[in-house]
Amino acid sequence: LIVISAQTEADIAELETYEEKQMFLEDLGLKESGCNRLIKAIYSLLNLETFITAGEMEVKAWTYRKGWKAPQCAGVIHTDFEKGFIRAEVIKYEDYIQYGSEAAVREAGKMGVEGKEYVVQDGDIMHFRFNV
């Protein structure tokens, strides 16, 4: 059972910064919004996870089924990515947070290069190499 207050969610939506939202939630004794709890519960029930792609102009989250391998996840972006999959460069979300940038992760030797059998993990930051 997930209890959600429409008024509380509306109040959160009106706040501009992440910090303001966190302070508001803390004042209510909450760790996260009802919407976030609902989304997490739905993802869990449907066996879904998220990987991330990031470029200079855009960062995007992509939904996939838990247990999918790298080529299948590449296909979520475009079928040509799956057909011509070569490899995936992978940064673990926690490593990105710790080091602060792709360059710093690479310099620390924490960027992985994975093949067709790699099972994508929730939160992985992916860069797919392909040839069609």
Feature roles, as predicted:
Residues 1-121, 126, 131:
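C-terminal-of-GTPase-core extension/linker across diverse P-loop GTPases
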